[in-house]
């Protein structure tokens, strides 16, 4: 007797810091006519049976967060088969760190290794087409105020230029360099990763001076960052 063919899709919805989103909802359509939606479990996980050979598009959503999309092409394999797709959602209310953005030393030129992270941002903006964002570049407290402000502005504009060249409308983007004027506030995730920091600590120059040398360097690295902040969610919504 042949085993029953059961294909199962599993995964999680969580925010970019890695914490589950128990209020998440997933919308799912398939080329077999599937058109459904379902909520996730309290731990942000989900599990649903899928049909062998069917192609699916899934949209992960949660109130207060930007949408994320995944695609699945179920195989024709017989027996039990499992797939996993996770949805990582960016906050629509708080600044979001753009991981793995790198510039040439003391310049605004993006390195080639930044492309993957920026292309993910392009995909997110294409999917969330009614969103406008601020691109914010920050420096650490080393270097002069005017120099840091000029450098951070140029870096924010470099990111904006990249996105525009990839097809994102420039009027959806605002580039702002903050220099060293907006030090990073420690998040829960950061406090878990760096035990000498507490959630809510602000990495000011005065705070950093109280730390040992290695800890100071970590804080300077955390302050050197590029983030985006959602400004509007109604861009061309009523046109």
Predicted regions and their residues:
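Periplasmic peptidoglycan-binding/tethering modules of Gram-negative envelope proteins
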Residues: 1-132, 171, 193-196, 202, ...
């Amino acid at each position: 007797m042949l085993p029953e063919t059961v294909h199962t899709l599993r995964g999680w919805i969580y925010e970019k810091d890695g914490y589950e989103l128990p209020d998440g909802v997933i919308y799912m359509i398939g080329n077999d006519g599937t058109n459904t939606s379902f909520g996730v479990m309290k731990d942000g996980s989900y599990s649903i049976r899928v049909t062998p050979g069917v192609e699916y598009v899934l949209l992960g959503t949660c109130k207060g967060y930007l949408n994320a999309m995944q695609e699945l092409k179920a195989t024709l394999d017989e027996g039990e088969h499992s797939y996993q797709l996770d949805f990582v959602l960016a906050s629509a209310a708080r600044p979001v760190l753009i991981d793995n953005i790198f510039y040439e030393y003391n310049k605004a030129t993006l390195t080639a290794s930044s492309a993957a992270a920026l292309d993910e941002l392009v995909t997110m903006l294409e999917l969330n087409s009614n969103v406008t964002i601020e691109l914010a570049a920050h420096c650490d407290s080393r270097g002069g105020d005017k120099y840091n402000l000029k450098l951070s502005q140029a870096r924010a504009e470099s990111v904006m230029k990249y996105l525009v060249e990839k097809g994102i409308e420039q009027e959806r983007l605002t580039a702002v360099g903050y220099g060293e004027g907006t030090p990073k506030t420690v998040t829960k995730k950061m406090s878990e990763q760096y035990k000498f920091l507490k959630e809510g600590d602000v990495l000011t120059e005065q705070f950093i001076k109280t730390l040992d040398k290695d800890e100071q360097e970590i804080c300077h690295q955390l302050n050197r960052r590029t983030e985006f902040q959602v400004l509007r969610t109604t861009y061309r919504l009523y046109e």
